[in-house]
Amino acid sequence: MDRGPQDRPGLLRTWGPLAAVLAALAAVAVLVLAGDGTGTGSAGGATATTALPPGEGLPEEVLPFSVAEERGVADEIDWGPTCDPTTGVLRLPLSPAPQCFAPFTGDNGGASATGVTGDAIRVVVYLPQRNDPILSFIYRQIGNTDTPDKVFATYQGFNEILDRYYETYGRTVELVPYEATGNISDPVAAAADAETIARDLQPFAVVGGPLLTEAFSDTLAANRVLCISCGPGQPTSWYEERAPYVWDIAKNPQQNLMLVAEYVVKRLGGRPAVYGGEGVRGRERRLGYVYLSSTPQTEQLRRGFEAQLEEGGVELAETASYEDPVAIAARAGEIMARFRDAGITTVLYTGDPLAPQALTRAATEQGFFPEWVITGSSLVDTTIFGRTYDEQQWRRAFGPSNLFARVSPEVAGSGYLYRWWHGEPPPAQQSALILPNLQLLYAVLQGAGTELSPEQFRRTIFAADIVRGSVIAP
């Protein structure tokens, strides 16, 4: 594989391994436009089993390597130095490797949407408020020293790499920083920030956003501005109502809870607790549920989760919600006492990675040692946060996870890619969601062609084949 222009064997700094672990949050779906261009659905009366000509539905100027092979023209194309023509994938140390697209020549038609000219695609990078009290509290738990400046510099570094390798049809992605005016849970500031971005910066897209309020993504959608990873996860219907503007990287909470419900029904319900402590182990499981209520849709998600459990013959004996991951310490004792008195053997948890600190400490103080079911909530299943929970409690934790097998950051991952190209670690060592956000953006730009718009962005995603993952790249 070709090496970057400043290849040196420098090591990642102290928290480099975290970047590789946190990349699991992304669960990046690598988009490869190929085949019939309609996914597994139907179009124009054709069924999913109807054989269509190779590349049917693709814009004329968009030619993936696999389609060129099917058409028998791959050998006639000069794929350029960034493509490995023996495999049809880009010469990038990414897994799975992105497919090559034929180099574009000619006129791209100029402006095609707000923020899109003949030369550039304007993309705003949302940066958190400096010294955001909530983020500062979270960062202190894991020694994170990232600043907005470091985060934006890392975005720029990855953007340089992807701009070199992906086909964007004569346009360059232009990143514009925007620093938030409020903390990540402030809906008023979030809505005002979104209005300012839409009115004054007029971008094609925004990447990033406040993760504890939907006001930012909701306001951007109302202003017809596309955004990626710009707010907390929502039910599927929420995204559909705001289509084609709001996109996320990971599966949404509704999809995650469906997975958790299936796991609980098939593996836990009606069976004895085997990982609990004294007074719990051996008893038939009695479930309690603790969850973060951060959006108006949270209760809708909870009701759907309970309904799916009940369909499988499993009931939640107790539930408890919280809204503030920092203030949960004041309620943790009451929640755990209620669960203990209700005879709960098994605690299901969906929320932020901080609350289990207070919950597990409170449980131990009360001599209550239930099972803890990991549900794939962001970062809760990572070692770096797990080490901050009460050890006597977390030794009893198990359940489904979104994480993949660990790989040394010296041989793979976002930090490795950055170092491979720039010869030094990324400025923001712990901002592993940066690369997936840009990967999604560039993958869609490459498949969308010259007529770029939010609607074409959506069509491109839904026309893409699903690329199977692996134990190191789910």
Residue ranges and their predicted role:
Residues 2-24:
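N-terminal export and membrane-targeting signals
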Residues 26-52:
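C-terminal region of N-terminal signal peptides and the immediate post-cleavage residues
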Residues 52-196:
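N-terminal extracellular/periplasmic Venus flytrap/periplasmic-binding protein-like
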Residues 78, 203-319, 371-399, 405-406:
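Extracytoplasmic ligand/sensor domains, especially the bilobed periplasmic-binding protein
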Residues 111-112, 137-149, 177-184, 244-251, ...:
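Second-shell loop/turn segments in exported
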Residues 145-153, 184, 188, 210, ...:
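Soluble non-cytosolic domains of exported or imported proteins
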Residues 150-156, 163-242, 249, 323-330, ...:
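Beta-alpha junction/loop-to-helix N-cap segments that form part of ligand/metal-binding clefts
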Residues 421-431, 442-474:
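Segments of small-molecule ligand-sensing domains
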